[in-house]
Amino acid sequence: MKKQMFLSAMLLALCLASGLTAQAQNTDPDDANLETQLYLIVGTNQDVDEARLPASLDGVVKQLRASLPFKNYRLAATLINRVKNEGRLQLSWIGGPLASVSGAASGGASPVTPSFSQFNVRQVKLQRNSENQSVVQMLGFNFGARIPIQVSGAIAANGAVAPNFNYENTGVSTDISMRESEPVIVGTLNVGPSGDAIILVVSAKRAPK
């Protein structure tokens, strides 16, 4: 009888241990996927209709109004991507929101002279900060763009003026960390001679399975 009770207790202990191991494996951060969101916000002093930004960016907008001199802000683009914990992220595209911003600022970007953009993160990783809060670390964060700027005009044989362009590089590289689902300002990039700027905002959180 005692032997049977001992075997039953051992079996129960093994089952509990297996369940705890499986639960630990399911919550292992190494198995997690992360959803990253990169927001491109345009700051301008031009008289334009200011569009409503997402409620999730209210804190960011309040911070921008307190620290930057722009009259208006609008959301130019939102880039959403999914990446495995401790994985890397690479994006590149032609044209898009920077084309319209640089075109308005300098008469530059067009289908013939588009802008070129890229967004890279060497590693996206879940961590714990000193307060034991879950944070997302982005190592090797890099955003860059090549934007056409009109510098002069060449006179053709028929008298028409053909504009000349130079491509200017702009971008930011850094390492950052943030609490999950909390947008943070990474940096600002001046675009063209008008004084307009692109403000980079990023957030990240665990993606649903």
Question: For each predicted feature, which ranges?
Answer:
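Outer membrane pore-forming secretion/assembly proteins and partners of Gram-negative envelopes
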Residues: 2, 22-209
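Twin-arginine (Tat) signal peptide motif
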Residues: 2-8
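Bacterial N-terminal signal peptides
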Residues: 8-19
